[in-house]
């Protein structure tokens, strides 16, 4: 794949090591947490432990492409309509099937990163593992300040007000005790942007 030509295995290994390092710090933070009950804390630790890391580019093409075909004589509109119908048919067949956690939701060349609560995974395509975000020539401190901040940000989505609704398998399932969920909601309100105002205008930010 094209992305494979843009990122060395050493860079993939280096950023993967950074992910493991930051995940370890998340575990330390959870261990030292003072407001979560042991039951919820244990489930949060399990969610971290089962989080999958996708780095650089997918090892195989998305299986959807095995089901797409057009005729050489098709005009553009006909080809688009055929591909659209084939894509819809593919997704309908996925209903009720086990989730393929190895499937990527973004291409390897994309300059972005993501956390998927439905799979409990974080994805770092080759596109974002390039300057000005990352370089093997930079110091560890520089890479932690750039890519490391992005890694920490994406992991945090697993415990934000949306990610917290899903368990370690990506199921929409409440894994919080009522008291812990109430405490979490109160802490979320404390950092809500709705409480911030621009002093010059008195408008909410």
Label the model's feature ranges:
Residues 9-197:
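Intrinsically disordered, low-complexity linker/terminal regions across diverse proteins
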Residues 1-7, 198-205:
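Short, small-residue-biased leader/transition segments that mark boundaries at the very start
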């Amino acid at each position: 794949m094209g992305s494979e030509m843009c990122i060395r295995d050493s860079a993939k290994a280096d950023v993967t090591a950074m992910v493991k390092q930051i995940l370890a710090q998340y575990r330390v933070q959870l261990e030292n947490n003072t407001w979560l009950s042991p039951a919820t804390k244990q489930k949060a630790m399990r969610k971290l432990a089962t989080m999958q890391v996708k780095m650089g580019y997918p090892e195989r093409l998305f299986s959807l492409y095995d089901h797409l075909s057009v005729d050489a004589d098709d005009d553009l509109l006909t080809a688009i309509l055929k591909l659209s119908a084939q894509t819809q048919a593919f997704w309908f067949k996925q209903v009720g099937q086990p989730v393929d956690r190895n499937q990527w939701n973004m291409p390897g060349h994309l300059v972005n990163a993501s956390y998927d609560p439905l799979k409990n995974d974080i994805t770092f395509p080759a596109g974002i593992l390039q300057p000005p975000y990352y370089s093997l020539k930079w110091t560890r401190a520089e890479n932690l300040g750039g890519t490391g901040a992005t890694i920490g940000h994406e992991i945090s989505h697993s415990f934000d007000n949306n990610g917290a609704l899903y368990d370690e398998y990506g199921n929409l399932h409440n894994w919080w005790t009522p008291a812990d969920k109430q405490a979490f909601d109160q802490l979320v309100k404390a950092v809500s942007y709705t409480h911030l105002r621009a002093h010059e205008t008195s408008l909410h930010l």
